[in-house]
Curated annotation (Swiss-Prot):
Cytoplasmic side: 38-57
UniProt record, GO biological process: mitochondrial cytochrome c oxidase assembly
Full protein name: Cytochrome c oxidase assembly protein COX14
Subunit structure of this chain's protein: Along with COA3, core component of the MITRAC (mitochondrial translation regulation assembly intermediate of cytochrome c oxidase complex) complex.
GO cellular component, one term: mitochondrion
Lineage: Eukaryota, Metazoa, Chordata, Craniata, Vertebrata
Organism the protein comes from: Bos taurus
Length: 57
């Protein structure tokens, strides 16, 4: 039978691990959103430049 201290240690480690995983997952989601944002921005910029050049001809 685990003692109160052992239960507290297990609870603390479980909580710490879950917070660490949430932080890593949040960072992943943030970086994916930033990547897609910059991809869309560059494709829009390229499309606008193509439209300018085709309109000038």
């Amino acid at each position: 039978m685990p003692t109160a201290k052992q239960l507290a240690d297990i609870g603390y480690k479980t909580f710490s691990t879950s917070m660490m995983l949430l932080t890593v997952y949040g960072g992943y989601l943030c970086s994916v959103r930033a990547y897609h944002y910059f991809q869309r921005r560059s494709s829009r910029r390229q499309a606008a430049e193509e439209q300018k050049t085709s309109g000038a001809l």
